[in-house]
């Protein structure tokens, strides 16, 4: 019996829910920039007996017996992560990117210390000091942003704020910034004011690993990332550093500082994903992600849709929907009606609330995994533009949905995931 057979036999209700999600992923175009499709091997690793094993501590230094084989798995993940990013030390245990960031804060900061991070509305992340997040409640937060004219990082502002506030930690790396991050310039500023420098590369980790974005590991004191998104692994976190002594502090901040037992089945999946990312095929994939983003951006701009900062250097872009008199909330709904999955997003200096927004964030990693090239993304740009420019036209909506269905059929996803029909009798 396969794992699907076991699920159907034991809990057909859950199986039916999973089946519907499989069908949604297969029949929709995934353009959420933070999402991707893992390989069957990554998914298989997460479904192994490693889920049964407690393994508090680190390889060779556990608090439980019977860890000799999970030690091998975790050490392999560590070694591959170090090789992939050129790091001296890696911790593969964080359950998420947020957990990785919290561990760094515990290792380097005390409550009340000053940190600097990008404003969430300009493309930052909740864990970089947003007032609704614990990082914004425990620390004195100074936010920087983008220049109002270029919509690119305002490094003069970053330097001035750092000199004025003397932060203990400066965070660079973002969730909705479509341009290359100048890590070297951040390093100069951090050195000038005596601050630690942390890069959160959750969105661009795959591009960094494959050489399509500058690597922050040689320049930053610590680097955090998720292991999904452009890295195309399981949902999880990772901490990297070039400093072995700092690495020991970071290890203690993960366990026992912020977590208990690691998820060894997920760590096994991380090891598989890192192994995949070390292969030439992954570099080719990331190059296609970039080319597809350029094609999508060009197609949208050719149809009078304004992009924040005028385009993209990486895998994502932001449409300023004020050019078509729509909100992000409205555009997200319009896309959903034609089976394109996106997310509303604030844009710099957004006049709308975070629950409404004036932007729509798009990314190319997931559809690139399905096999899309510049040709298909040119068509995707047409479909998006047609829908946004004529939101009330039912004929256009139906035609867009038909084109989406044809693209999905042309590039099937997970054809091996076969469920009995129907799951629920």
Curated annotation (Swiss-Prot):
Positions of post-translational N6-(pyridoxal phosphate)lysine modification: 229
Swiss-Prot/TrEMBL GO biological process terms: glycine biosynthetic process from serine; tetrahydrofolate interconversion
Enzymatic reactions: (6R)-5,10-methylene-5,6,7,8-tetrahydrofolate + glycine + H2O = (6S)-5,6,7,8-tetrahydrofolate + L-serine
Disulfide bond annotation, renumbered to this chain: none
Gene3D superfamilies linked to this entry: Aspartate Aminotransferase, domain 1 (3.90.1150.10), Type I PLP-dependent aspartate aminotransferase-like (Major domain) (3.40.640.10)
Position of the signal peptide: none
Cellular compartments per GO CC: cytosol
Named cofactor requirement(s): pyridoxal 5'-phosphate
Enzyme Commission (EC) number: 2.1.2.1
Keyword set, alphabetical order: Amino-acid biosynthesis, Cytoplasm, One-carbon metabolism, Pyridoxal phosphate, Transferase
Localization per Swiss-Prot or TrEMBL: Cytoplasm
Pathway: One-carbon metabolism; tetrahydrofolate interconversion; Amino-acid biosynthesis; glycine biosynthesis; glycine from L-serine: step 1/1
Transferase as UniProt keyword: yes
EC class name: transferase
Classification via SUPFAM superfamilies: PLP-dependent transferases
HAMAP family: SHMT
Family to which this protein belongs: Belongs to the SHMT family.
Protein name, per record: Serine hydroxymethyltransferase
């Amino acid at each position: 019996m396969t794992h699907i057979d076991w699920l159907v036999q034991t809990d057909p209700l859950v199986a039916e829910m999973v089946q519907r999600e499989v069908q949604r992923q297969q029949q929709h175009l995934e353009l959420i920039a933070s999402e991707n499709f893992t390989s069957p091997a990554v998914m298989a690793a997460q479904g192994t007996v490693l889920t049964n094993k407690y393994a508090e501590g680190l390889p060779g230094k556990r608090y439980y017996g019977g860890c000799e084989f999970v030690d091998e798995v975790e050490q392999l993940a560590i070694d591959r992560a170090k090789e992939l990013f050129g790091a001296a030390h890696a911790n593969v245990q964080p359950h998420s990117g947020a957990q990785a960031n919290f561990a760094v804060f515990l290792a380097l900061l005390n409550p009340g210390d000053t940190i600097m991070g990008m404003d969430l509305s300009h493309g930052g992340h909740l864990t970089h000091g947003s007032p609704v997040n614990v990082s914004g409640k425990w620390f004195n937060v100074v936010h920087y942003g983008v220049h109002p004219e270029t919509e690119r990082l305002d490094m003069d502002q970053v330097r001035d704020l750092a000199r004025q506030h003397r932060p203990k930690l400066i965070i660079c790396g973002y969730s909705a910034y479509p341009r290359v991050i100048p890590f070297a310039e951040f390093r100069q500023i951090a050195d000038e004011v005596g601050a630690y420098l942390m890069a959160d590369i959750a969105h661009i980790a795959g591009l960094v690993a494959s050489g399509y974005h500058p690597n922050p590991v040689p320049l930053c004191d610590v680097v955090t990332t998720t292991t999904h998104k452009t890295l195309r692994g399981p949902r999880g976190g990772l901490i990297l550093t070039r400093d072995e002594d700092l690495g020991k502090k970071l290890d203690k901040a993960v366990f026992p500082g912020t977590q208990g037992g690691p998820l060894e089945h997920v760590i096994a999946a991380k090891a598989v994903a890192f192994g995949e990312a070390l292969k030439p095929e992954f570099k080719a994939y990331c190059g296609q992600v970039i080319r597809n983003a350029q094609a999508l951006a060009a197609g949208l701009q050719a149809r009078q849709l304004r992009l924040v900062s005028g385009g993209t250097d990486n895998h994502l872009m932001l449409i300023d929907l004020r050019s078509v008199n729509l909100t992000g909330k409205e555009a997200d709904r319009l896309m959903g009606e034609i089976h394109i999955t996106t997310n509303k997003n604030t844009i710099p200096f957004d006049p709308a609330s975070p629950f409404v927004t004036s932007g729509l964030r798009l990314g190319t990693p997931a559809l690139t995994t399905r096999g899309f090239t510049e040709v298909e993304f040119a068509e995707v740009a047409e479909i998006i533009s047609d829908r946004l420019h004529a939101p009330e036209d039912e004929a256009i909506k139906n035609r867009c949905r038909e084109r989406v269905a044809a693209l999905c059929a042309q590039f099937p996803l997970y054809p091996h995931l076969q469920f009995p029909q129907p799951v629920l009798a």
